[in-house]
Amino acid sequence: MTDVDIKIENIVASATLGKSIDLQTVAEALENVDFNREQFPGLVYKLKEPKTAALIFGSGKLVCTGAKSIEDSKRAIKLTVDMMRTMDPDIPEEFEIKIQNIVASANLGKPLNLEAVALGLENTEYEPEQFPGLVYRLDDPKVVLLLFGSGKVVCTGAKSAEDAKLGVEKTKARLAELDLI
């Protein structure tokens, strides 16, 4: 299979603490927090290192976004929970962190004729009047690729970096098979 370099642009991960959280208390105790219940039901806690944002909800659910690696994503959630535990010692030590979405980019190295790609590949959507990219859905791995005429690609929906890379590599191989690249 054709080897392609991918760059992870964003990882979204979540955790459920199994306990409700008093957002007002958290907002008052932490720095770098945006909290306005009328605009958004949770609070946004911005970490400097790793540079991420944690969305904290009253239900005890956390969502971390902005990490460039799975390790940073997990570290950001753990740091956020540790910070919250200083205010509420009943927050559990053990909780599961789930990777929800990985967004990665790649360059196929050659321009693409998106009209020809739309005709050649199945499971595509291409409406240039609406969006300049072609949407290509794969079943294995279950990812969505946005292909652009420049040859640049954005992969979304991956649960691992390996799935993102595999999705891009399979797509490049299929395009080569059809003489579209």
UniProtKB/Swiss-Prot annotation:
Record keywords: DNA-binding, Repeat, Transcription, Transcription regulation
Coiled-coil blocks: none
Pfam families in alphabetical order: TBP
Biological processes annotated in GO: DNA-templated transcription initiation
Domain of life the protein comes from: Archaea
SUPFAM superfamilies assigned to the protein according to its UniProt record, in alphabetical order: TATA-box binding protein-like
Single GO MF descriptor: DNA binding
Sequence repeat intervals: 8-84, 99-175
InterPro entries attached to this UniProt entry: TBP (IPR000814), TBP_archaea (IPR033711), TBP_CS (IPR030491), TBP_dom_sf (IPR012295)
NCBIfam families for the chain: PRK00394.1-2, PRK00394.2-6
HAMAP family: TATA_bind_prot_arch (MF_00408)
Function, as annotated: General factor that plays a role in the activation of archaeal genes transcribed by RNA polymerase. Binds specifically to the TATA box promoter element which lies close to the position of transcription initiation.
Similarity remark: Belongs to the TBP family.
Database matches in PANTHER family: TATA-BOX BINDING PROTEIN
Protein name according to UniProt: TATA-box-binding protein
UniProt lineage: Archaea, Methanobacteriati, Methanobacteriota, Methanomada group, Methanobacteria
Gene: tbp
